[in-house]
Amino acid sequence: MVFVNLQLKIKKGLESEFIDELNVLLKETRSYEGCHAVYFIQNQDDASNIEFCSKWDSKQHYEKYLQWRIESGVLEETANKYGDGEPVWRYFDLVSEF
C-alpha cells in the first residue's frame, strides 16, 4: 500500500474553477485500477495551495495511472491553465493503521 501526496499551487482567482474541473476528473481517478481513495484538500490559509492525497495498491499502480493522464493530455492542459509553479509528488509507505 502506498500513499501519494501531490502538492499544487494554483493561479490566484482560478481556485474555484480548478476545483470544479478536478471534481469531475477525480471520479475517473477513483475508479482506476489500484486506487482505493482520493482526498482533494485545500489550505485554509492559502486557497491557491491544493493537495491530493491518494491511496494505491502500489507505486507502480499510481505510475500507470499517471502515465495514462499524461498520454491523455489532460495533465498538461490542466497544468498550463491553472498551475502556478511545479507540482511536488511525494510517496509514503503505510507504517500503521488504527
PLM-predicted stretches and their roles:
Residues I41, R90-F92:
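Solvent-exposed beta-strand sheet faces enriched in polar/charged residues
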Residues L22, L26:
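Short amphipathic alpha-helical/adjacent loop interface patches that line ligand
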Residues V2-L8, Y39-L66:
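Short, well-ordered beta-strand segments in beta-rich or mixed alpha/beta enzyme
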Residues S31-H36, K55-W89:
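An amphipathic, aromatic/His-enriched active-site/gating alpha helix that lines ligand/cofactor pockets
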Residues S16-I19, E63:
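Generic structural signal for individual residues within well-ordered alpha-helical segments
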Residues V95-F98:
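A short acidic, often aromatic-flanked loop/helix-cap motif at beta-alpha or helix-coil junctions
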Residues M1-V2, E17, E33-C35:
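Short, flexible segments with low predicted structural confidence
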Residues K9-E17:
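Short, surface-exposed ligand-recognition loops at beta-strand->loop->(often short) alpha-helix junctions
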